């Protein structure tokens, strides 16, 4: 394989000649330090290479070494609980090797530890017919994750050999498959190119909600397992805290958090918090189900693209094992900015605001890899990849290209409003601008498993919030006293919805996570208040009298979100009784 020669260097872009027969997206090693790069354009025998490491110090005429392989990652036991850079190099291994807190250029470290022995339990026997995606055995990687060892998608045939139960490294052959005379060894680890989606048998409609413990996300704008969501918002509106809440409390089996071009402090927060936090669904440390990919703002720009693909490929791998995985990316705007930077250096024709014309297709490729699927292989199983990505529009302008193009491909939109954030209303998700295309799909699950009136209660809350916004314009002009009594009740109910339900403290031990049952109980209190109060208003009782009769009950309902734990829901029975008693007394007064 012939090596190339550097002819031009422009930041992270290197042009090399003598690259005849090179392939698009082939990985190459650039210069004497052997920096990792990827071919993104070929013109004759010239290759345009985006380099994933700092190119300072390399010179024209230095060699470019071809590898003949696309950018691939290692998939196997040892991924959970690790923190990788954008090229899937484990940061702890780099620190041990270099004895430095900085990543040395050109360093090569195996993604999966070669020395650790894993206890393998075989699930198939010699002579079995094997095809890609079959589970041939399991490794208990963490107390939370049973790592299912899969046959690589391109392998099929008869199982010629399989090892006995025991301890093996990821490089030890654990099985041999006879593929029409050719022998294919299977190891605990396999490699997969990051730009190629992993195969599946069938894509299914997402019908089960991905519970997040955040009330506004679960109830007002729910996301389904296998869904796609975007969280756009200006600086300081709470994107990172919302995404961290998703990563901490979501009912996903595996969470992959990609810090793409954001501040390093945010990844440090994750590393500091996750080992001490308990997963509310299992009671185990959160790090036992989490993989972190750190590609922070001070790391090379080009590697941002790689980090997004590395994250989604790992998510697909765990999906193929039959798990529900969540990929959290913060933020895709930084990836788009990297594409713009490289497009400018390659002298491509810019589109809107300087972004490349292929930005929509790149975003579409990324979001298309989400979904709930029936996997290939035996036994039959179902898995999902849910994608939630932050978008950082400059100045909060949602019409800029990255936000507007992202909106074409996602089914859930959680827009963050800086005016809500300034009013200390968190999560600062604007309930008038947001939407979810999954409400109809997940309503049946909520009605069956949580509360048969869930859809009715949710729709009442949404209608009230929309009507309150219409009335707010009138109140600004003529004041609240001129409103009809039923409209005054709308304002009071909307205040209760916002204070008792939509506001949530991500740093409060009790309020940070609301179980579906707790959410339904709070909704039920608001629904009862609105239903009974509407009846009384129709009978001529003023809204002010109803609110005054409540005394301290409404503040008690508002405080209940941070006072009543998820396993103490019987305390809501007492609040419900008090509420009904107040209305019964008012009805007696109205009847006399």
Swiss-Prot record:
Membrane topology of this protein: Peripheral membrane protein
Subcellular location: Cell membrane
Catalytic activity: ATP + H2O + 4 H(+)(in) = ADP + phosphate + 5 H(+)(out)
Family annotation (InterPro entries): AAA+_ATPase, ATP-synt_VA_C, ATP-synth_a_Xtn, ATP_synth_asu-like_sf, ATP_synth_asu_arc, ATPase_F1/V1/A1_a/bsu_N, ATPase_F1/V1/A1_a/bsu_N_sf, ATPase_F1/V1/A1_a/bsu_nucl-bd
Entry keyword annotation includes Nucleotide-binding: yes
Keyword terms, alphabetized: ATP synthesis, ATP-binding, Cell membrane, Hydrogen ion transport, Ion transport, Membrane, Nucleotide-binding, Translocase, Transport
Complex and partners: Has multiple subunits with at least A(3), B(3), C, D, E, F, H, I and proteolipid K(x).
Family assignment from sequence similarity: Belongs to the ATPase alpha/beta chains family.
Main function: Component of the A-type ATP synthase that produces ATP from ADP in the presence of a proton gradient across the membrane. The A chain is the catalytic subunit.
Identification of the protein by name: A-type ATP synthase subunit A
Originating organism: Saccharolobus islandicus (strain Y.G.57.14 / Yellowstone #1) (Sulfolobus islandicus)
């Amino acid at each position: 394989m012939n090596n190339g020669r550097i002819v031009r260097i422009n930041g992270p872009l290197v042009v090399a000649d003598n690259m005849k027969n090179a392939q698009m997206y082939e990985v190459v090693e650039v210069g004497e330090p052997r920096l990792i790069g990827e071919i993104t354009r070929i013109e004759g025998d010239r290759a345009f290479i985006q380099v994933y490491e700092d190119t300072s110090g390399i010179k024209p005429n230095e060699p470019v070494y071809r590898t003949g392989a696309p950018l691939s990652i290692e998939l196997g036991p040892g991924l959970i609980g690790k923190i990788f850079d954008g090229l899937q190099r484990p940061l702890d291994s780099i620190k041990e090797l270099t004895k430095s807190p900085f990543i040395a250029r050109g360093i090569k470290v195996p993604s999966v530890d070669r020395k650790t022995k894993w206890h393998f339990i075989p699930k198939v026997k010699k002579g079995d017919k094997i095809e890609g995606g079959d589970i041939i055995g399991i490794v208990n990687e963490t107390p939370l994750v049973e790592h299912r060892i899969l046959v690589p998608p391109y392998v099929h045939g008869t199982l010629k050999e399989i090892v006995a139960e025991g301890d093996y490294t990821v490089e030890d052959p654990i099985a041999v498959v006879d593929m029409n005379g050719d022998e294919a060894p299977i190891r605990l680890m396999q490699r997969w190119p990051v730009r190629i989606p992993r195969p599946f048998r069938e894509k299914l409609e997402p019908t089960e909600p991905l519970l997040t413990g955040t009330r506004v996300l679960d109830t007002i704008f729910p996301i389904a397992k296998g869904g796609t969501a975007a969280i756009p918002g200006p600086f300081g509106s709470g994107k990172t805290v919302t995404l961290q809440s998703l990563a901490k409390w979501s009912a996903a089996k595996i969470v992959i958090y990609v810090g793409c071009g954001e501040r390093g402090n945010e990844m440090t927060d994750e590393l500091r918090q996750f080992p001490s936090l308990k997963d509310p669904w299992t009671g185990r440390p959160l790090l036992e189900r989490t993989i972190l990919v750190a590609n922070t703002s001070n790391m090379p720009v080009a590697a941002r693209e790689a980090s997004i693909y590395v994250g989604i490929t790992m998510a697909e791998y765990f999906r193929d094992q039959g798990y529900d995985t969540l990929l959290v990316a913060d933020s895709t705007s930084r990836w788009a900015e990297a594409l713009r930077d490289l497009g400018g250096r390659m002298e491509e024709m810019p589109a809107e605001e300087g972004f490349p014309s292929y930005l929509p297709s790149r975003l579409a490729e990324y979001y298309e890899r989400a979904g709930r699927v029936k996997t290939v292989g035996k036994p039959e199983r179902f898995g999902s990849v849910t994608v939630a990505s932050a978008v950082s529009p400059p100045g909060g302008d949602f019409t800029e290209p990255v936000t507007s193009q992202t909106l074409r491909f996602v089914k859930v939109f959680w827009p963050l409003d800086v005016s809500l954030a300034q009013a200390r209303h968190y999560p600062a998700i604007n309930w008038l601008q947001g939407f979810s295309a999954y409400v109809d799909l997940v309503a049946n699950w909520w009605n069956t498993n949580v509360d048969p009136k869930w859809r009715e209660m949710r729709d009442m809350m949404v209608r009230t919030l929309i009507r309150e916004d219409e009335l707010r314009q009138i109140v600004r002009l003529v004041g609240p006293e001129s409103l009809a009594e039923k409209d005054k009740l709308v304002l009071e109910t909307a205040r209760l919805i916002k204070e008792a339900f939509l506001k949530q403290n991500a740093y409060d031990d009790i309020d940070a996570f609301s179980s579906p049952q707790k959410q339904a109980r709070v909704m039920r209190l608001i629904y009862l208040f609105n239903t009974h109060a509407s009846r009384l208003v129709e009978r001529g009782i003023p809204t002010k009298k109803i609110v005054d009769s409540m005394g301290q009950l409404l503040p008690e309902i508002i405080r209940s979100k941070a006072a009543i734990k998820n396993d103490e829901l019987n305390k809501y029975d007492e609040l419900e009784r008090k509420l009904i008693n107040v209305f019964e007394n008012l009805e007696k007064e109205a009847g006399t």
